[in-house]
Amino acid sequence: MEEAKGPVKHVLLASFKDGVSPEKIEELIKGYANLVNLIEPMKAFHWGKDVSIENLHQGYTHIFESTFESKEAVAEYIAHPAHVEFATIFLGSLDKVLVIDYKPTSVSL
């Protein structure tokens, strides 16, 4: 299959450290969501908590998904001063993190 054209999804799976309060987590999520207003290449942001009954989460409790127009836009986002500043605070609050960038691909049958 050839690489899909179109947007890139930047997905971050996270588990917060035990000492991070629910209020602090809410503040961090709002800060993450606000990056879409500060960094032009970031087109959309969604997040959620694990609700699976399969118990395959490997300790990850939260998922964050950002949408970009290209891989180059993701690189621009990562280097942006607002992201660098936020990431320092955000990552310092996490026990575990996993990041994957992918292009949504449809399968023709």
Swiss-Prot record:
Annotated GO CC locations: cytosol; plasma membrane
Organism superkingdom: Eukaryota
Induction: By salicylic acid (SA) and jasmonic acid (JA).
PROSITE patterns: S_R_A_B_BARREL
GO biological process: defense response to bacterium; defense response to fungus
Domain Stress-response A/B barrel: 8-102
Entry's Gene Ontology molecular function annotations: metal ion binding
UniProt keyword annotations, A-Z: Magnesium, Metal-binding, Plant defense
Cofactor: Mg(2+)
Chain sites annotated for binding Mg(2+): V36, I39, E40, M42
Record has Membrane as a keyword: no
PANTHER family: PTHR33178, STRESS-RESPONSE A_B BARREL DOMAIN-CONTAINING PROTEIN
Subunit-level organization: Homodimer.
Functional note: Heat stable protein involved in defense against fungal pathogens. Possesses antifungal activity against diverse pathogenic fungi. Possesses antimicrobial activity. Possesses ribonuclease activity.
Record-given protein name: Stress-response A/B barrel domain-containing protein HS1
Organism: Arabidopsis thaliana (Mouse-ear cress)
